Amino acid sequence: MKKLIILLSVALYACSSSDENPNPIQVDEDNNPPVSQSFTSFLTGKSTDLVTSPDGGVCLMGGSTENDQAMKWFLERANGGDVLVLRATGGDGYNSYFFSELGVTLNSVETIVVKNAEASTEDYIHQKIKNAEAIWFAGGDQWDYISYWRNTPIATLINDAISNRNIVIGGTSAGMAIQGGYYFSAKNGTVTSSTALNNPYDTDVTVESDDFIKNEFLSNVITDTHYDNPDRKGRQVTFMARVLKDSGVQIKGIACDENTAICIDDNGIASVYGQYPDYDDNAYFIQVNPELITVEPENCAPNTPLTWNLDGNAISVYHIKGTEDGNATFDLNDWTTGTGGTWENWYVDNGALID
């Protein structure tokens, strides 16, 4: 009888413990997050959440090596809070870089590597997004991010964090490519400028605008990255021509070279960071020439080279060299006011971009 009472007591205790917290989210004694088949997580810093008031903004980075000054700008806007790194490949390379190498005090840096679309339902990831003051998207393949997260709770929570908690957000390479309201999805793989310019309707020219990441100053923008390796001016101009031809919408373009970053504050002022004049680091703010009445491409059709000439004035571009101090700026409120850059006209003639 005594053994029976003990067994019943143990069973009742186990049941009551489970009922109180059926899905506990916690780290183990070594500060490691739970193991999951759909994601892997790496935590540096404190496992307890620290609530701060982030300053908002967006950091767009063109790929290759990160620009330290732009990364400091990004991290400082978390105001000592928690930074979440989301990626579909790779490991914890950002953790120590963010947490201890840039001189910015943070509560934690956690990298979550998602392995499949099933991760979008994971409560652990949901909670980490809710706790983050900053979210950074690593490079990789943007189609992974789009196919895993678009129209899922993860996208909803990220957008809620942007609009309601004013978190700072950003990404490099593929992580930059998904930040605009329009985006090259790479659903069928990448596409070169030559291919796009010579056939704007090639199956690899996959421009989409279904709701994904909603950044206030990028709702009518398509971004592009690695602009100098290889040259991607032609394909981005083709993306813009396609949208104009197919839907009548005059979208704008933002792009930067590798090792270059564009930091947009919550007032819509974009600052460009790079290492010019030591290196030729460039950023571009591209729009249909606002002074023209007729703006559509002369020839944008399947299996035909693009012509978007309009007497050499089709596209208006504000070109900035990125510097360590990020002093050159462009105003995304009016797409007219800039400091430290130069205006250029680009156009396309029979599949050849002239810039």
Predicted regions: what they are:
Residues 136-139, 162-183:
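Catalytic nucleophile loop
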Residues 142-152:
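Glycine/threonine-rich flexible loop motifs
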Residues 28-80, 90, 95, 190-355:
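C-terminal and late-domain segments of enzyme folds
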Residues 4-12:
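Sec-dependent N-terminal signal peptides
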Residues 12-37:
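Bacterial Sec-dependent N-terminal signal peptides
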